[in-house]
Amino acid sequence: MDVIDAIHTRRSIRSYSPHPVERDLIEEIIWDAAQTPPPFSGQVPWTFNVLEGVERIAAFGNEALKYARDSHPAGPEWDWRNRPGFQVFWGAPVVVIISGPVEDCCRAGQTFMLSAHARGLGTCWVGSPMLWLRTASTKAKLRIPAQLMPVSALCLGYPATIPEAPPRKRPSIIWVE
């Protein structure tokens, strides 16, 4: 698969096979994400924390959901908290958390998703647990270095289903002459 195919065919996967992902494969994808994007800060300032096991990850997701319900004001951006059957990590067998400077983690996260897709794996970048992930107690529990900020929470696994591409709008392009 070439990079253009990967960009146009990658989908956010929200339904995963229970088949575990091999650690060697996870490490290869992390290597791609850590070594290939140019670092914004001129160094390699991030960490990758890997969670494995559907039940264990679901328990962390329930903690994140409880934190969101207990700690945040109501509003349309928080409607996901009350959706029946909502799962923070979508039943994924692996979640990778990238922590560090925002610019670097976003580059690493996108590269991670494309590398996984090229290897037949599905991903979904989830934003719902981010405030929970940034609490001192959660960072300690997940062994995220205290001085780093979690930026990317990426579900990873073999897709059970692959959704169709949604309709896309043309981007707003402003030529400055």
Name every feature range the model reports, one short phrase each.
Residues A33-A34, V96-K141:
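Small-aliphatic-rich amphipathic alpha-helix that forms the alpha element of a beta-alpha
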